[in-house]
């Protein structure tokens, strides 16, 4: 019965059209690879895999919609398990009611969440529950936590990574105790934050790195921040990254979108929408980068840039919810609790705001001069005006009726 359900769902999810050899898109083959986890089989399964992916779910209800939603999640996991079958990654489901004791032991407390066990670490996946996103996330997770830079061409590739937090350190060798501490620190943040290292003096010179020094790069910033007081312990590196992991300007990414959205400041986000591939969107993004660089020392400023191309399924929802047109650049302040929002007036694509105008608008947001509560008040005022109009219309009708009665007399 399970396979029959999965095949039905798979027909809707995946195209079965034939393609030329070399471009055969994976379709679910009907083999069950995702198993139910229990206290009895937990240790056996844990020993079998280097990485264990666990979907912690509420008991499946009798509601047909809930059942279909569960089956959709199940087929996504089955497809991911099929694609990564050769990678020694296990996939299991944990029923919150049947396996409550095991879930408590593992520290699971949020139904509908996906957890990954790697060694003694538990990583919660806080991104889009889609097969392609999950595959990329898990492949990043099984790689070494630190990528080694050995040449000037690799330095160029490193420098082109601008929308991620990244760290790079210079060490004597892979056997160095300080490199080991760096590697251990990297495991705490894998795969969300990228760690790089070099043992090459030429590479270190090009990056202005001294022996045992680590530079911290905030997204979209021109210059790195050297971490003070080298050499560092693992704990010191972890503490520094945690204190600086909310950038001034960051990109909303499918692999950690919910974690980013929950990391708000006082319940709000400053949200620009801009397509990087579009000329106007690219220009607007460059202006935003300039504003972020000029205000990188402001701890109260956090801007979450969204490229609509990254989230095609959400474009219509955002346009309806925020009442904006995402075919042109936008910037607004969004209340994460109720999605109330206020958006900067941008007349047209040919008249984008300058960096100074954006800074003034952002200052008004941070000071509270512009806020989503004002938008609520305006809506209430509009409703009151409409009520007054209705009252006036009602009174006019009564007066007309009175006049008619007098005429009849």
UniProtKB/Swiss-Prot annotation:
* Residue span of region Disordered: 364-409
Q: Name one GO molecular function term.
A: calcium ion binding
Q: Name one GO biological process term.
A: regulation of cardiac muscle contraction by regulation of the release of sequestered calcium ion
Recorded GO cellular component terms are: sarcoplasmic reticulum; sarcoplasmic reticulum lumen; terminal cisterna; Z disc
Q: Which residues carry this modification: Phosphotyrosine?
A: 282
Q: Where in the cell is it found?
A: Sarcoplasmic reticulum lumen
Q: Does the keyword Cytoplasm apply?
A: no
Tell me which positions the record assigns to the signal sequence.
1-19
User: What does this protein's UniProt record list under function?
Assistant: Calsequestrin is a high-capacity, moderate affinity, calcium-binding protein and thus acts as an internal calcium store in muscle. Calcium ions are bound by clusters of acidic residues at the protein surface, especially at the interface between subunits. Can bind around 60 Ca(2+) ions. Regulates the release of lumenal Ca(2+) via the calcium release channel RYR2; this plays an important role in triggering muscle contraction. Plays a role in excitation-contraction coupling in the heart and in regulating the rate of heart beats.
Query: According to its UniProt record, where is this protein mainly located?
Result: other
Self-association state and partner proteins as the record states: Monomer, homodimer and homooligomer. Mostly monomeric in the absence of calcium. Forms higher oligomers in a calcium-dependent manner. Dimers associate to form tetramers, that then form linear homomer chains. Interacts with ASPH and TRDN.
UniProt keyword terms in alphabetical order: Calcium, Glycoprotein, Metal-binding, Muscle protein, Phosphoprotein, Sarcoplasmic reticulum, Signal
Tissue specificity: Detected in heart muscle (at protein level).
Glycosylation site list: 335
Point to the regions of Acidic residues compositional bias.
Answer: 373-409
**What protein family is recorded?**
Belongs to the calsequestrin family.
InterPro entries (alphabetical): Calsequestrin (IPR001393), Calsequestrin_C (IPR041860), Calsequestrin_CS (IPR018233), Calsequestrin_middle_dom (IPR041858), Calsequestrin_N (IPR041859), Thioredoxin-like_sf (IPR036249)
Kindly name one Pfam family recorded for this protein. Answer: Calsequestrin
Record protein name field: Calsequestrin-2
* PTM remark: Phosphorylation in the C-terminus, probably by CK2, moderately increases calcium buffering capacity.
**To which species is this protein native?**
Oryctolagus cuniculus
List the SUPFAM superfamilies hit by this protein, alphabetically: Thioredoxin-like
């Amino acid at each position: 019965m399970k396979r029959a359900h999965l095949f039905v769902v798979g027909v809707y999810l995946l195209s079965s059209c034939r393609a030329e050899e070399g471009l055969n898109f994976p379709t679910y083959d009907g083999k069950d690879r995702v198993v139910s986890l229990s206290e009895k089989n937990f240790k056996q399964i844990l020993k079998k895999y280097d990485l264990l992916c666990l979907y912690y779910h509420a008991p499946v209800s009798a509601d047909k919609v809930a059942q279909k939603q569960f089956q959709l999640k199940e087929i996504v996991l089955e497809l991911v398990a099929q694609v990564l079958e050769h990678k020694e990654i296990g996939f299991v489901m944990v029923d919150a009611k049947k396996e409550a004791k095991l879930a408590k032991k593992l520290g699971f407390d949020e139904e509908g969440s996906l957890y990954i066990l790697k060694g003694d670490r538990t990583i919660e996946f806080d991104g889009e529950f889609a097969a392609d996103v999950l595959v990329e996330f898990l492949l990043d997770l099984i790689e070494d936590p630190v990528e080694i830079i050995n040449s000037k061409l690799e330095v160029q590739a490193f420098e082109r990574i601008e929308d991620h937090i990244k760290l790079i350190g210079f060490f004597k060798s892979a056997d160095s105790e300080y490199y080991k501490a760096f590697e251990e620190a990297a495991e705490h943040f894998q795969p969300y934050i990228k760690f790089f290292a070099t043992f090459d003096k030429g590479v270190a010179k090009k990056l202005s790195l001294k022996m045992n020094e680590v530079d911290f790069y905030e997204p979209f910033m021109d210059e790195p921040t050297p971490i003070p007081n080298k050499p560092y312990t693992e704990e010191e590196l972890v503490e520094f990254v945690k204190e600086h992991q909310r950038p001034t300007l960051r990109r909303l990414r499918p692999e950690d979108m919910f974690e980013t959205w929950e990391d708000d400041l006082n319940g709000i986000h400053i949200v620009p929408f801009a397509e990087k591939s579009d000329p106007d969107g690219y220009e607007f993004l460059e202006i935003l980068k300039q504003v972020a660089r000029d205000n990188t020392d402001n701890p109260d400023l956090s801007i979450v840039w969204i490229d609509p191309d990254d989230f095609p399924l959400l474009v219509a929802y955002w346009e309806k919810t925020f009442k904006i047109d995402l075919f042109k650049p936008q910037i607004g302040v969004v209340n994460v609790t109720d999605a109330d929002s206020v958006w900067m007036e941008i007349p047209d694509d040919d008249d984008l705001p300058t960096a100074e105008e954006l800074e003034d608008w952002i200052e008004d947001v941070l000071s509270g001069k512009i806020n989503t509560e004002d938008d609520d008040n305006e809506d209430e005022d509009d409703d009151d005006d409409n009520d007054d109009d209705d009252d006036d219309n009602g009174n006019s009708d009564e007066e007309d009726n009175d006049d008619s009665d007098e005429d009849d007399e």
